[in-house]
Design a protein with these regions (language model features):
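N-terminal secretory signal peptides that target proteins for export/translocation
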Residues: 1-11
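Intrinsically disordered, low-complexity regions of eukaryotic proteins
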Residues: 4, 18, 305-308
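Short, solvent-exposed secondary-structure boundary motifs
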Residues: 7, 147-152
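Sec-dependent N-terminal signal peptides
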Residues: 9-22
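Hydrophobic alpha-helical context, especially transmembrane and signal-peptide helices
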Residues: 20-22, 122, 148
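C-terminal motif of bacterial Sec signal peptides marking the signal peptidase cleavage site
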Residues: 25-29
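N-terminal secretory/targeting leader peptides
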Residues: 30-133, 151-154, 158-308
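Signature of the catalytic double-stranded beta-helix
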Residues: 137-148
Length: 308
């Protein structure tokens, strides 16, 4: 009798154990497998961006909008950290930073962007664009996209960052200053006896660049978020520049511009127009429609577009 009771109890314990095992397997099949995937989807992607912009520059403000829009579109799964001028030490260049993985993206100043693509030297030439709208059409359109695709294969160009027109300061040694640089000099009363000209000759463009290998590791959705956010921030930046001319802000910051009727203004304007034509003449064999982005007036109705 005792042996039968023992056997019965043993069988009961076995059934309980078997039931627990089956329940564990069932739970693993229904709820266990997706857990790692869920955790991965919630993992944040951090994008560090190095620039040589001041915090109040036009280019930095566009990148701030880009960062905000990207975080919103990705529902906080992508976070952008911007670094302005002075936050990165030399001797390493921005190209070195992105190659070493110190940052994910860099906004290249002229010397470094020319190092990656010598043809980008064109963007330092005066009077390439006939209006602010022409600049926007160029960098937002197919011509700008083609120019970005000429970067070395190991790099990917997200887009061109607009930083406004440069201003010519003549204190005995003429030099071009960005909006942010001139604003600082005006606010700190550091212009002294310098003469400043608003020639609308050079518009500052810097490519936002990352490694192609890093870009390829992103999902299609992440790439789309980045591209859409950058494009929307670009549109907003140009709308703000059109709505309120940055030169007006400089005037309120203590900057005084020479009138365009003065001999000095006329002299510099003619000088830089000649510089542009000489550059085009020397590079006529290599410049295509998108390397020479002078935008002419729209053709009259019925006329066909001509290559610039």
């Amino acid at each position: 009798m005792e042996k039968g009771v023992f056997t019965s109890r043993k069988c009961g314990a076995f059934l309980v154990t078997l039931t627990i095992i089956l329940l564990m397997l069932l739970l693993a099949g229904c709820g266990g497998a997706p857990a790692p995937q869920s955790a991965a989807s919630e993992q944040k992607l951090a994008i560090r961006v190095a620039t040589d912009y001041r915090n109040d520059s036009i280019g930095y403000q566009q990148l701030q909008d880009f960062a905000r829009l990207l975080q919103e579109k990705s529902e906080n799964t992508i976070v952008v950290k911007l670094y302005s001028t002075g936050e990165w030490s030399q001797p390493d260049s921005f190209i070195d930073y992105v190659k070493l993985g110190s940052v994910e993206m860099v906004c290249l100043e002229p010397a470094e962007m020319n190092q990656l693509q010598p043809a980008y030297a064109l963007y330092q030439q005066p009077y390439l664009f006939d209006s602010l709208q022409a600049v926007e059409r160029y960098i937002s359109g197919e011509a700008g996209s083609k120019a970005l695709r000429t970067l070395p294969q190991s790099y990917y160009g997200v887009g061109f960052v607009p930083d406004g027109y440069q201003y010519l300061m003549d204190d005995g040694q003429p030099q071009w200053l960005s909006y942010g640089e001139l604003k600082q000099k005006g606010q700190t009363k550091a212009l002294g006896d310098a003469v400043v000209y608003d020639l609308r000759a050079i518009y500052s463009l810097q490519p936002l660049v990352t490694l192609q290998s890093w870009w390829d590791e992103l999902s299609q959705e992440q790439q789309t978020w980045i591209q859409e956010s950058f494009a929307e921030a670009l549109t907003a930046s140009f709308a703000q520049q059109a709505d309120k001319d940055p030169a007006q802000t400089l005037l309120s910051s203590g900057v005084v511009f020479q009138d365009n009727a003065t001999p000095g203004w006329q002299s510099y304007s003619g000088l830089y127009l000649n510089q542009r034509e000489n550059y085009f003449a020397e590079h006529s064999d290599s410049l295509t429609a998108y390397w020479r982005p002078v935008v002419a007036e729209p053709p009259a109705s019925g006329e066909e577009d001509e290559a610039p």
